[in-house]
């Protein structure tokens, strides 16, 4: 069973309210639980297989509807190649959006679906940031979670609303169709750790190129 974890430390609840309150910690961390050996890990970073002269899109099919993402291949070729390679390998199939915060973002890419654990290097490698401060973190933006500089792996988040995050997270795409599905996912009931009470599942991710 694959074991991953993504911990978001940007918001806390206070005063008995479910509304988020910003703290001084504005980091989105990728962490990993220790447990069963992963069914699918890699010994090294994937080789570049995409053509930066082509246009790539992904249809992220979820249990609540589909979202089509257009990738920023020229801005973040390494990150796009990583996501596409993992998606084609079925890495995201059956993974849930394990952390959902309305009016902020939805997080996925953590096959364990948990919210606690030790830092780790999964899916078996980490790769460098491709930061671009010319692209705002606006609604529909797709970006990588990390646990510090140059620690990207498989986990990602999609912005529910425009938000002035620090430019610490590689932006590598944007939802161009099905943006209403972000609203649907962001509106689900959540429990401890901002995890949806009922699983929101990534059924599969279909990649196209032109």
Where are these regions (language model features)?
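Sec-dependent N-terminal signal peptides
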Residues: 4-12
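Cyclophilin-like peptidyl-prolyl cis-trans isomerases
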Residues: 14-210
């Amino acid at each position: 069973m694959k074991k991953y974890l993504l911990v978001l430390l940007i918001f806390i609840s206070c005063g008995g309210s479910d509304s988020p309150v910003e703290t001084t910690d504005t980091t989105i961390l990728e962490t990993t639980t220790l447990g069963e050996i992963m069914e699918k890990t890699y010994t090294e970073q994937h080789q570049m297989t995409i053509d930066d002269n082509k246009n790539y899109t992904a249809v992220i099919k979820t249990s609540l509807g589909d979202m089509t993402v257009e990738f920023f291949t020229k801005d973040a070729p390494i990150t796009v190649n990583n996501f596409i390679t993992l998606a084609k390998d079925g890495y995201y199939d059956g993974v849930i959006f394990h952390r959902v915060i309305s009016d902020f973002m939805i997080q996925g890419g953590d096959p364990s679906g948990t919210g606690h654990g030790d830092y780790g290097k999964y899916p078996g490698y980490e790769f460098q940031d491709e930061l671009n401060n010319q692209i705002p973190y606006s609604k529909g933006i797709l970006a990588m979670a990390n646990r510090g500089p140059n620690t990207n792996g498989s986990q990602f988040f999609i912005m529910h609303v425009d938000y002035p995050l620090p430019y610490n997270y590689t932006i590598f795409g944007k939802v161009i169709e099905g943006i209403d599905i972000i609203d649907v996912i962001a509106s689900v009931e959540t429990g401890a750790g901002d995890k949806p009470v009922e699983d929101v599942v990534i059924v599969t991710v279909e990649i196209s190129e032109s």
